Design a protein with these regions (language model features):
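Beta-strand elements of well-folded, non-transmembrane domains
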Residues: 11-15, 30, 57-61, 100-104, ...
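A common structural junction motif
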Residues: 29-34, 73-77, 114-117, 138-142
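Glycine-rich, aromatic-bearing surface loops/beta-hairpins
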Residues: 95-142
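Short, conserved charged micro-motifs
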Residues: 17-21, 61-68, 105, 127-131
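Short glycine-/aliphatic-rich beta-strand segments at the starts of folded cytosolic domains
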Residues: 7-12, 53, 90-94, 116-120
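Mid-chain, well-packed structural core segment of small domains
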Residues: 68-101
Length: 142
């Protein structure tokens, strides 16, 4: 069964990081283009410059993103995500964080620090179906 998927991508780029490398890595690894991102310049707590990158992808592009994501993660990492569906899902949104430095190297890895935040949304009308629906999504490419 194909599910309607919408994906939000949020990245904080610090002054010491090269935004163009990060954007190029998204295109190379996950096929998300520079023009898909909204770019906002702001300041951190100590007035340090930071850039917020945000993208929202839908329909066929979101399906392609999921396929690339699941193909790039190890089978163990995908199984770990499946095991953690209940803990990672809030209001039909599955939350996962990817290592920003690994993406720049052309790899994907699940991490909790200095990360790229992904929110994968699909309509779940009955909360008890959440695990089943997200398991189906993750097993498409597994």
């Amino acid at each position: 069964m194909v599910h309607k998927i919408e994906i939000s991508i949020d990245v904080i780029v610090h002054a010491t990081e090269d935004m163009s490398k990060i954007l190029q890595s998204f295109e190379d690894v996950l096929d998300v283009k520079r023009e898909d991102f909204a770019i906002e310049e702001t300041e951190g707590h100590y007035e340090n410059p930071i850039i917020l990158l945000n993208a929202k992808i839908v329909k066929k592009q979101a399906q392609n993103f999921m396929n690339k994501l699941l193909e790039s993660l190890s089978k163990e990492q995908v199984n770990e995500l499946i095991d953690e569906i209940a803990e990672r899902t809030i209001d039909s949104r599955f939350h996962v964080r990817l290592d920003k430095q690994e993406l720049i190297k052309g790899n994907l890895a699940i991490r909790e620090k200095d990360t790229i935040q992904l929110k994968i949304h699909t309509p779940v009308y009955n909360k008890k179906d959440t695990v089943k629906i997200f398991t189906e999504i993750f097993q498409i490419a597994n």
